[in-house]
Design a protein with these regions (language model features):
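Bacterial N-terminal signal peptides that target proteins for export
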Residues: 1-10
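C-terminal motif of bacterial Sec signal peptides marking the signal peptidase cleavage site
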Residues: 18-20
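A short beta-strand motif characteristic of beta-propeller blades
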Residues: 28-34, 74-80, 113-123, 165-176, ...
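Beta-rich, blade/repeat-based domains predominating
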Residues: 36-48, 54, 63-64, 80-101, ...
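Beta-propeller domains
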Residues: 55-72
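A short loop-to-beta-strand structural motif that recurs across blades of beta-propeller domains
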Residues: 64-68, 103-105, 155-158, 202-204, ...
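Short loop/turn segments that connect beta-strands within beta-propeller blades
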Residues: 70-74, 107-112, 160-165, 207-211, ...
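Glycine/small-residue-rich hydrophobic helix-like segments
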Residues: 200-204, 208-258
């Protein structure tokens, strides 16, 4: 259950954020599942309706990662390639930002890639940069899931200013609940950051000023992505168990859809009609209709 002393204010702030971002642009392609992707991890939609998908391809194989784009008719093409292990995506203005292993990339509208934040710009060289989130002030937030495959240590969350300065918000040595931070969701003020932990499956709220954590909900297995609907409903994906859950304003968890091989970093379309779910192991992008969503 959501902790009621933080739930109301956080959902109110998130509701204001999403209401300001809605679009009525029709989704001509939305019923068409995208197949044939190479280890899709994250997805984000631009204001013009295009959908960008990060494709890792082979983990640890540098240079074989790419970003694909789906146009308004459902046609898929390569937007940028020769990446390493691209994961989280965020859009600020006309630029696409990508969390790629230990660095943050910036891609212009023509698909030209540059390094926005190098590994050396972080207080500590990251282990496994994962999700990426932007706030309304133009800041980026990135999760470092830590040394997932060995020690299980090193989890952290960072804030990146518009000019590329990096600030540590929280790390595992500050709070033992920080294990493998993954999916991120910022409110409209930048004062709170909701995130789900991949190892514990717990959903948290992080106060970005005080670096204090509040438990919101649990039971998400291998928590991967988290998004918010203007009705007040949040959606969380469980990578390990191939499921997507909803959490309503009362704190009730419901299974939205299961059967995925690995439900990765989800997104909501600008018109809020569909939930976008990359199935990493299946190589697909699924569209879940959100008709009749209630708070």
């Amino acid at each position: 259950m959501l902790k009621r002393f933080v739930r109301y204010s956080l959902f109110l702030a998130l509701g204001l954020l999403v209401l300001g971002c809605q679009s009525t642009k029709p989704m001509m392609y939305a019923s068409k599942k995208i197949t044939g992707l190479k280890t899709p991890e994250s997805v984000v939609q631009a204001k013009d309706g295009r959908i960008f998908i990060s494709e890792i391809n082979a983990f640890g194989q540098d240079g074989d990662g790419r970003i694909s784009v789906v146009d308004q008719h459902g046609n898929v093409s390569i937007f940028a390639d020769n990446l390493d292990d691209p994961k989280g995506l965020a859009i600020i203005g006309e630029y696409l930002y990508v969390a790629d292993k230990t660095k943050i990339l910036k891609i212009n509208p023509n698909g030209q890639v540059s390094v926005f934040v190098s590994a050396e710009a972080f207080p500590h060289v990251p282990f496994f940069l994962n999700d990426l989130e932007a706030d309304l002030q133009g800041n980026l937030y990135v999760s470092d899931s830590g040394d997932l495959f060995n020690t299980g240590k090193g989890g952290a969350i960072y804030k990146i200013t518009p000019n590329g300065e990096v600030k540590l918000l929280i790390k595992d040595t500050q709070d033992t609940r920080v294990i493998a931070p993954n999916g991120l969701l910022a409110d409209d003020t930048g004062n709170h950051l909701i995130y789900v932990d991949f190892s514990s499956g717990v959903l948290y709220s992080l106060n970005t000023s005080t670096s204090t954590l509040s438990d919101l909900a649990d039971g998400f297995g291998g928590g991967d992505g988290v998004v918010h609907h203007s009705s007040g409903v949040m959606y969380v994906s469980d990578w390990k168990n191939g499921k997507v859950y909803s959490v309503n304003m009362m704190g009730d968890l419901s299974l939205v859809k299961g059967g995925y091989q690995a439900a990765a970093d989800i997104a909501i379309t600008k018109d809020e009609r569909y939930l976008l779910v990359p199935d990493m192991k299946a190589g697909e992008l699924d569209f879940i209709a959100l008709d009749g969503v209630k708070p």
